[in-house]
A protein has these predicted regions:
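Alpha-helical residues within the helix-turn-helix
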Residues: 34, 51-52
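Short, cationic-aromatic polyanion-contact patches
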Residues: 3-12, 28, 59-84
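N-terminal helix-turn-helix DNA-binding core of bacterial DNA-binding proteins
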Residues: 2-38
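Amphipathic alpha-helical dimerization/coiled-coil segments
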Residues: 77-120
Length: 120
C-alpha cells in the first residue's frame, strides 16, 4: 500500500467511524451500520479493506437470536500518523500488537497532479 492509499483509508469517513467504534469493544457490521448510519454494503466494503490492511480483525463469531452467525470486529489500530514534509508524504500505523507499519518509509514522493485553473 502506498502512503496516499494508507492515508485515505484511515481518513475516510466510514472507515474512521468503524475504527473509533471498535477501538474498545468488538462490534458487528450490522451494529456499525445501524449505530453510525453507514450503509450496510459500504460498511462491509470498509471492513474488508480495513481487515486486508491489518487495521481491524474478527475477534469472535456470535449467534444472533435468529441463529445466524455474525462476525464481531475489533480495531487493531492504536495510533495513526500522517506526515507531510517538504512535499513528501509518509504514513505510520502503530498496531495494538506493538507492530509499526510505515508507508513511504524513505520519504518517497507521491505523484500528485497539478491543479489546472481555467484561464480567462
Amino acid at each position: 500500500m502506498d502512503p496516499l492509499e494508507a492515508s485515505r483509508l484511515v481518513t475516510d469517513e466510514y472507515s474512521a467511524k468503524i475504527l473509533v467504534a471498535t477501538f474498545k469493544k468488538p462490534k458487528s457490521a450490522i451494529d456499525l451500520s445501524r449505530e453510525y448510519g453507514i450503509p450496510i454494503a459500504a460498511c462491509y466494503r470498509r471492513i474488508h479493506a480495513l481487515e486486508h490492511a491489518g487495521l481491524i480483525r474478527c475477534t469472535e463469531r456470535a449467534l444472533t437470536q435468529k441463529g445466524k452467525r455474525i462476525s464481531l470486529y475489533m480495531s487493531q489500530l492504536k495510533n495513526a500518523y500522517i506526515f507531510f514534509e517538504n512535499g513528501r508524504l509518509r504514513v505510520r500505523f502503530q498496531l495494538a500488537t506493538g507492530i509499526t507499519r510505515d508507508f513511504g518509509g524513505d520519504w518517497k514522493a507521491v505523484d500528485v497532479l497539478e491543479p489546472s485553473f481555467p484561464t480567462q
